[in-house]
Amino acid sequence: MLISNEWLKDYVDAGVKVEDLAERITRTGIEVDDMIDYSKDIKNLVVGYIQSKEKHPDADKLNICQVDIGEEEPVQIVCGAPNVDAGQHVIVAKVGGRLPGGIKIKRAKLRGERSEGMICSLQEIGISSNVVPKAYENGIFVFQTEVEPGTDALTALYLNDQVMEFDLTPNRADALSMVGTAYEVAALYQTEMTKPETQSNETSESATNELSVTIDNPEKVPYYSARVVKNVSIEPSPIWVQARLIKAGIRPINNVVDISNYVLLEYGQPLHMFDQDHIGSKEIVVRQAKDEETMTTLDNNERKLVDTDIVISNGQEPIALAGVMGGDFSEVTEQTTNVVIEGAIFDPVSIRHTSRRLNLRSEASSRFEKGIATEFVDEAVDRACYLLQELASGEVLQDRVSSGDLGSFVTPIDITAEKVNKTIGFNLSNDEIQSIFRQLGFETTLKGETLTVNVPSRRKDITIKEDLIEEVARIYGYDEIPSSLPVFGEVTSGELTDRQHKTRTLKETLEGAGLNQAITYSLVSKDHAKDFALQERPTISLLMPMSEAHATLRQSLLPHLIEATAYNVARKNKDVRLYEIGRVFFGNGEGELPDEVEYLSGILTGEYVVNAWQGKKEEIDFFIAKGVVDRVAEKLNLEFSYKAGKIEGLHPGRTAIVSLEGQDIGFIGELHPQVAADNDLKRTYVFELNYDAMMQVAVGYINYEQIPKFPGVTRDIALEVNHDVPSSELKQIIHNNGEDILQSTLVFDVYEGEHLEKGKKSVAIRLNYLDTEDTLTDERVSKIHDKILEALQAQGATIR
């Protein structure tokens, strides 16, 4: 938002230099990103009057002008502008003057004729071509009224000014207007703020006889009003209006269109001007667009509408796209005489979706998207009527034609001085706090010790008492907060929490296994929000997503990890191993906060490098992925169990559910071939674990264990079992019967095929026996070993 200091003084005069004002505003939370000084680098720029013009004898495109610049004698200036003519008041840079870009004005001869100065265009004095009026886009600027020759040109142009550029956060939409900024400045400097004049002289004719207004969907359009102004004269706006629009970054068009833009900047309330004679009826109907309905907007583009768009219609066809852009056949033109002024409240979400879908961003749509002040809707329309009367000789009809309800202009919030002072460390009285709120334009009432503050609708960022406390701190001054040293009790040395220790260990383990940490977005598309979710829970969607691809909070980390892997593989990085620790979100129904759960996920594809210098590589498979998960469990002193399972999006025969203490906490598996193909991936393996559940298991610290002093005994067994019996089940039976001397088991071979009965498989398992206190005897080992074999046979296994 560009704030002209010259314009701001119409409403409030802080009595300080603009640099000091900018510094003060920045310290209170609105960042002044830049300062534009139109007088910088300009010297000896005056208004000149062209007394005569003659063609240059040796150049067809040059003219010799005699120009009165307020000195004893006129000066001769050679000018090549196509629109230069005698009788014009123009901008002249005198000899010895300077223009932006380091241009120095010197006496010169052009094709043999002396030239003592330069007749300037607006671009040559530093105005951007984007905002120069069309009439002067390719030539010099000509004043529309008489100005005394020799007058300082910047003063005559209302450009002897400094403009502050605000870098506003989304919550401070109130500062997107001159009036909103004036309230802020008045509060900062404890001075009075003067509002713009809105009272016009109305005719005896009523606008209710000219048109009617109907709203079809009050949820999308809570309020719509219109006023009628007759017999306007279309002409260029006065120079002061044009200058203020230019300084705000808007190109002047004509007085009627300029007034709608002027009031937009003044109040932050978008208006639209219709040519009443081209609306096509006396009826205005605000409705949802019909699917496939079309209209041509002011930029001469035909737009195809959808049923979520809001349109202003004449009862039959659209005449404007609500809050975004008007239609072409009802626009104000040079022939317009009667004007209908629209002021309305539109649903911010609908306006934003329409604006984004059609790629139509405007000053109006950006304000509707952030929400407008209901208190200013009718006031802004009245202001436009007043200006049309003053600047376009319009006749303002009585009454406004409206439909809907503006709602409350204020939101009451109770607060106490004790709460304010306790929160921010001030020692302010009720009177001082009330004074701050009154300067901000907030009405207050004090009852006992409770102060009720009526927050106006323009301050949509203030909804709770803490917001009010922030306002007190901002306006009174953060610099005024008393400084004090903290009081410390017993000081303890800092250390990592148990969870932090485990997380560090986990990261070291995964990175040691060759995985790289990834950090991805928490938002996914609605279509992928439930991909790979272990539990069926409601999703959480954003009210105003920036894009459809980031519209819903994730329930798994894998969708974005798959995207990241596909991105790398597409760029010739085919061996990808990533992990992520991040939060997922599960809904709890309307009005309830979601559950946030931390997950650990990983993805592996390509080849797994063992010793790159020896050329030893192996393709990543299920067991490598499982080995990574097993290593995590070992390092965290956890014991995972696995069972075959099915997860949507994973290979149905190569997926295992991971359990911890009887609770399913995740899975390991190969991506379903179709999912892999959709992402241009070869065989890819993933795992996802509930990290919060892992951290909740109480485990002791892993202490150092001495190397055994006594030798162990190893025995191998081969078992014939049904092919659907998992190896983990066999290992569990072995451990349940191995007593205290069975140290570990290892499945080292699985065979199905020739020499085995159909539906059977052979599983070879190595058993490691060890007694840390004594040497094992063959008799003792055999006794335990036989017990294990009997237990296996009892469960249907055949010893081979």
From Swiss-Prot:
- Textual note on the cofactor: Binds 2 magnesium ions per tetramer.
FDX-ACB domain location, by residue? 708-800
Any GO BP: phenylalanyl-tRNA aminoacylation
UniProt domain tRNA-binding: residue ranges = 39-154
Instruction: Tell me the superkingdom of the source.
Output: Bacteria
Cofactor(s) this protein cannot do without: Mg(2+)
User: Mind naming one GO cellular-component term on file for this protein?
Assistant: phenylalanine-tRNA ligase complex
**Catalytically driven reaction(s):** tRNA(Phe) + L-phenylalanine + ATP = L-phenylalanyl-tRNA(Phe) + AMP + diphosphate + H(+)
Binding residues annotated for Mg(2+), in chain numbering? 461, 467, 470-471
The entry assigns this protein to a family as follows: Belongs to the phenylalanyl-tRNA synthetase beta subunit family. Type 1 subfamily.
For this UniProt record, give its keywords in alphabetical order, as a comma-separated list: Aminoacyl-tRNA synthetase, ATP-binding, Cytoplasm, Ligase, Magnesium, Metal-binding, Nucleotide-binding, Protein biosynthesis, RNA-binding, tRNA-binding
Matching InterPro entries: aa-tRNA-synth_II/BPL/LPL, B3/B4_tRNA-bd, DNA-bd_dom_put_sf, Fdx_antiC-bd, Fdx_antiC-bd_sf, NA-bd_OB-fold, Phe-tRNA-ligase_IIc_bsu, Phe-tRNA-ligase_IIc_bsu_bact
The GO molecular function terms of this record are:
ATP binding; catalytic activity, acting on a protein; magnesium ion binding; phenylalanine-tRNA ligase activity; transferase activity; tRNA binding
Stretches assigned to coiled coil: none
Assembly and binders? Tetramer of two alpha and two beta subunits.
Q: What is this protein called?
A: Phenylalanine--tRNA ligase beta subunit
EC annotation from Swiss-Prot or TrEMBL: 6.1.1.20
Q: Which residues form the B5 domain?
A: 408-483
* Location(s) in or outside the cell: Cytoplasm
